[in-house]
């Protein structure tokens, strides 16, 4: 099977989908080698998608669908994703948090590497909880609903990816994506 992404993706976004694909293929209990996974980016405008800041969101959505586990609906997230499962920094985090708050989201997952970049306006302080993460297993732990299922999925992912959480290592240096 293959991962097919549509919606006017630029080069960086296409690479991001490939990283997500690698994590999903490592992660899933199911044999997905004979399944095609379609990812459609909607409302991308004429410029399309040029960045990797939706990587953790795409990975969470696909894993949720494959494993039939719901995603919390009061949550927004942004972050790039390495093939090892590390959540990498992205640009524009403050703006994204404020937009999520305006849209009614109660929690926002961001890369831990971006935590010091956050300078949200006072009016948004009490509207959202900002949750910094460094690994996809942390994203899934927060985002997926159903405690027993989530615990099992997160434990499995930590085993498969050799989680930075277990060995104490941190993602290597990376420059934020433009999105």
Indicate residue ranges for each PLM-predicted region.
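Peripheral, non-AAA+ core regions of ATP-driven protein-machinery
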Residues: 1-179
């Amino acid at each position: 099977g293959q991962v097919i992404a549509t919606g006017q993706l630029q080069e960086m976004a296409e690479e991001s989908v490939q990283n997500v694909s690698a994590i999903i293929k490592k992660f899933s209990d199911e044999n997905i080698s004979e399944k095609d996974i379609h990812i459609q980016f909607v409302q991308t405008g004429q410029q399309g998608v040029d960045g990797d800041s939706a990587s953790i969101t795409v990975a969470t959505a696909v894993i949720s669908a494959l494993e039939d586990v719901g995603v919390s609906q009061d949550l927004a997230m942004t972050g790039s994703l390495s093939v090892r499962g590390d959540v990498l920094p992205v640009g524009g985090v403050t703006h994204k948090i404020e937009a999520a708050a305006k849209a009614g989201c109660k929690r926002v997952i961001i890369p831990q590497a971006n935590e010091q970049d956050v300078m949200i306006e006072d009016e948004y302080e009490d509207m959202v909880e900002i949750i910094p993460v460094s690994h996809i297993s942390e994203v899934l732990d927060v985002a997926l609903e159903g405690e027993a299922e989530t615990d099992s999925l997160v434990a499995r992912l930590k085993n498969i990816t050799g989680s930075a959480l277990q060995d104490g290592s941190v993602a290597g240096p990376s420059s934020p994506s433009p999105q």
